[in-house]
Amino acid sequence: MQNIRLISHPLIEHKLTILRDKNTDPFQFRMLIDEITYLMLFEASRDFELKDTEVITPVATTKSKKLAQKIMICPILRAALGMLGSVFKLLPDASVGFLGFQRDEKTLKAEFYYAKLPKDHAERIAIVIDPMFATGGTAIDAVRFLKEKGVKKIKFISILAAPEGLNRFSEVYPDVEVYTAAIDRGLNEKGYIIPGLGDAGDRVFNTVY
């Protein structure tokens, strides 16, 4: 799976340990999601193209660089909303394209129900964000939708991933890079990542019952 990028960093591993803990409260969980995403984005943006520009400092004019391409962040509703704030810290000019998928608990398949993209979406690099990469079904459907809409460059950022989902995704879209902070043991009979961290959406929005 040459398109899979496993990000290894001491800070990420430390924060991920606390994130997994069932006793981590919702406020701290949200903060950790934000911080881990922030750190991962440095690696995911490593190959962004730059263009020449000039900047006037208080004492002189100098040649410099700035991003050459427009960015579109595509959070998969709802859990990925917890990752969105950290993206804006690094890419404040990015546009947002929302993708809505609802998991069917019986079939374990994701049902597409909503999309809202910026008008110039086909001109932008799309960074799809979703904290959990389990069966790979949602990721495949999201990338298929974006490609059908004319988006040419797509990256995927997910905090945790299962090997089953990564293998399935790579067979369909070997051209799309997936960045993850951990590849866990696998999936259980309900399609949840093991050992994982539970339902990320429920823990972000404090709807665990």
From Swiss-Prot:
Chain sites annotated for binding uracil: 193, 198-200
Mind telling me which CDD domains this protein's record contains?
Answer: PRTases_typeI (cd06223)
Please cite one Gene Ontology biological process associated with this protein.
UMP salvage
- Quote the record's activity regulation: Allosterically activated by GTP.
The protein's enzyme class: transferase
| The EC number(s) this enzyme carries | 2.4.2.9
- Family matches, as SUPFAM superfamilies: PRTase-like
Q: Which family does it belong to?
A: Belongs to the UPRTase family.
Name the UniProt record assigns to this protein? Uracil phosphoribosyltransferase
* The protein's required cofactors: Mg(2+)
- Record-listed 5-phospho-alpha-D-ribose 1-diphosphate binding positions: 78, 103, 130-138, 199
Keywords, comma-separated and alphabetical: Allosteric enzyme, Glycosyltransferase, GTP-binding, Magnesium, Nucleotide-binding, Transferase
A GO term, aspect molecular function: uracil phosphoribosyltransferase activity
Q: Which Gene3D superfamilies match?
A: 3.40.50.2020
Q: How is the cofactor bound?
A: Binds 1 Mg(2+) ion per subunit. The magnesium is bound as Mg-PRPP.
InterPro entries hit by this protein = PRibTrfase_dom (IPR000836), PRTase-like (IPR029057), Upp_B (IPR034332), UPRTase/APRTase (IPR050054), Ura_phspho_trans (IPR005765)
Q: What pathway does the UniProt record associate with this protein?
A: Pyrimidine metabolism; UMP biosynthesis via salvage pathway; UMP from uracil: step 1/1
The reaction(s) annotated as catalysed by this protein in its Swiss-Prot or TrEMBL entry are: UMP + diphosphate = 5-phospho-alpha-D-ribose 1-diphosphate + uracil
Domain of life the protein comes from: Bacteria
Q: What function does the entry list? A: Catalyzes the conversion of uracil and 5-phospho-alpha-D-ribose 1-diphosphate (PRPP) to UMP and diphosphate.
